[in-house]
């Protein structure tokens, strides 16, 4: 059992003197789980982390999804090392970027053409620009609670109803930008139709997480994505899939392959970089030809397509092509789901568990979670206590009730068995302190 965080606490105190909030992304802070110093990790290998105090953890954070092959996978590490030895940045075309683009196209047939960028935020931001250029329209639709990066246009909350325009979800986002965004509930065809009836003639595109990963793992209802395509295309707008989390996570060809629904544009990130910074976007040839130098929609990047990220991404996809890999993730996910539910029943802890293959979310509620409102109405205080108990047990989760547990190819049945036992001990403590 982990009992000391002395060095993490000291490091966080020092970090507060030099780094805003002591972290380089707010999701790493422990603010959402009752506060305290976040645990600072020193190294990772396979499914495990070791922190600066020497404590070992089974890792289900997986860097919020990208580390599907585990930490320091030898094939990926070798590719990165070779790329570094050859020079990490040229500012010129390379053979690696062509090879990687071909691999992405082969995996996802909806990608006639692709372009590499440096993050998922950039990828989404640029698909919006391209959609606006192609349609000549300005407004964007999105689903409530779905995170699409931190660019101004997507940091927008819902208005007072489905036919109202959005409001800024962050300081520094002008109201004028928020007025270009319509936010509707996920999994609700009627409100989508109502919004399109009012604003459809001004909408350039709708942003869709085909499987939600940002208020937990939430699947679309049967037929929902097909209806989104139908209604949005009837309005003359485009469908953009944000597959930054989902691509290569649940299936090699992404959520669009798993679900059998095809978007006009796709944004990628996370997993495709093998742990290095990356993003990509792509789609139909006639739409992508809006992008400079062929078309009027400008997008550029000094680091885009850099050899290190390309080599890492190629190596990651080569690992993910191994036979039986996704079946293993599903098998371990099912084992973990069954064990957590059994422990919840044993200790009389109310939870709802959403799982798809090797990713799951534990919500402290008895309600079904199909949209953001339901996810919001869950017990965050209880989750915060659970999170810290699991940390003491040597199990690393994301410090937010909205995030997923991500399995990697390196987790074992023994890891799952230990995790279930740890969940049982945590639930027992929560039950004793009700």
From Swiss-Prot:
Pathway assignment: Porphyrin-containing compound metabolism; protoporphyrin-IX biosynthesis; 5-aminolevulinate from L-glutamyl-tRNA(Glu): step 2/2
Swiss-Prot/TrEMBL GO biological process terms: protoporphyrinogen IX biosynthetic process
Catalysis performed (reactions): (S)-4-amino-5-oxopentanoate = 5-aminolevulinate
Subunit architecture: Homodimer.
Localization of this protein: Cytoplasm
Species this protein is from: Bacillus thuringiensis (strain Al Hakam)
PROSITE patterns: AA_TRANSFER_CLASS_3
NCBIfam families noted in UniProt: hemL, PRK00062.1, PRK12389.1
HAMAP family: HemL_aminotrans_3 (MF_00375)
UniProt-listed Enzyme Commission number(s): 5.4.3.8
Gene Ontology cellular-component terms listed: cytoplasm
Keyword entries, A-Z: Cytoplasm, Isomerase, Porphyrin biosynthesis, Pyridoxal phosphate
Pfam families for this protein: Aminotran_3
Similarity comment: Belongs to the class-III pyridoxal-phosphate-dependent aminotransferase family. HemL subfamily.
Keyword S-adenosyl-L-methionine in record: no
Cofactor(s) annotated in UniProt: pyridoxal 5'-phosphate
Source superkingdom: Bacteria
GO function terms (MF aspect): glutamate-1-semialdehyde 2,1-aminomutase activity; pyridoxal phosphate binding; transaminase activity
CDD domains: OAT_like (cd00610)
N6-(pyridoxal phosphate)lysine: residues bearing it: 270
Keyword Manganese included in the entry's annotation: no
Name of this protein: Glutamate-1-semialdehyde 2,1-aminomutase 1
């Amino acid at each position: 059992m982990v009992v000391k965080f002395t060095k993490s606490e000291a490091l966080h105190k020092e970090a507060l003197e030099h780094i805003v909030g002591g972290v380089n992304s707010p999701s790493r802070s422990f603010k959402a789980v009752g506060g305290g110093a976040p645990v600072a990790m020193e190294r990772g290998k396979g499914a495990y982390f070791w922190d600066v105090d020497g404590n070992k953890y089974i890792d289900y954070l997986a860097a919020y999804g990208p580390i599907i092959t585990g930490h320091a996978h030898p094939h990926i590490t070798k590719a990165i090392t070779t790329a570094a030895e050859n020079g990490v940045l040229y500012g010129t075309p390379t053979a690696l970027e062509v090879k990687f683009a071909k691999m992405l196209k082969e995996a996802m047939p909806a990608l006639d053409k692709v372009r590499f960028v440096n993050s998922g935020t950039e990828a989404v931001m640029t698909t919006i620009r391209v959609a606006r250029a192609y349609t000549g329209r300005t407004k964007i639709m999105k689903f409530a609670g779905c995170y699409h990066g931190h660019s101004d246009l997507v940091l927008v909350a819902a208005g007072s109803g489905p036919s109202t325009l959005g409001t800024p979800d962050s300081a520094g986002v002008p109201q004028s930008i928020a007025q270009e965004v319509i936010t509707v509930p996920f999994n609700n065809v009627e409100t989508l139709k109502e919004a399109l009836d009012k604003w459809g003639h001004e909408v350039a595109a709708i942003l869709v997480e085909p499987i939600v990963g940002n208020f937990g793992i939430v699947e679309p209802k049967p037929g929902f994505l097909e209806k989104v395509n139908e209604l949005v295309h009837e309005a003359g707008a485009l469908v953009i899939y944000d597959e930054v989390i989902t691509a290569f996570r649940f299936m090699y060809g992404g959520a669009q392959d798993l679900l059998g629904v095809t978007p006009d544009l796709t944004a990628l990130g996370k997993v495709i970089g093998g742990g290095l910074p990356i993003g990509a976007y792509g789609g139909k040839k006639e739409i992508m030809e809006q992008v400079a130098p062929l078309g009027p929609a400008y997008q550029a990047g000094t680091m885009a397509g850099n050899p290190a990220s390309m080599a890492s991404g190629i190596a990651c996809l080569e690992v993910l092509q191994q036979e039986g890999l996704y079946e293993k993730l599903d098998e371990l996910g099912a084992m973990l789901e069954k064990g957590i539910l059994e422990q919840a029943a044993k200790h009389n802890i109310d939870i709802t568990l959403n799982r798809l293959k090797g990713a799951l979310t534990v919500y402290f509620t008895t309600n079904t979670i199909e949209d953001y409102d339901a996810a919001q109405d869950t017990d965050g205080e209880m989750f915060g206590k659970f999170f810290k108990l699991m940390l003491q047990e040597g199990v690393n989760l994301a410090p937010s009730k909205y995030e997923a547990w991500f399995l990697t190819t390196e987790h074992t049945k023994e890891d799952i068995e230990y995790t279930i036992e740890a969940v049982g001990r945590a639930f027992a403590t929560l039950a004793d302190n009700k």
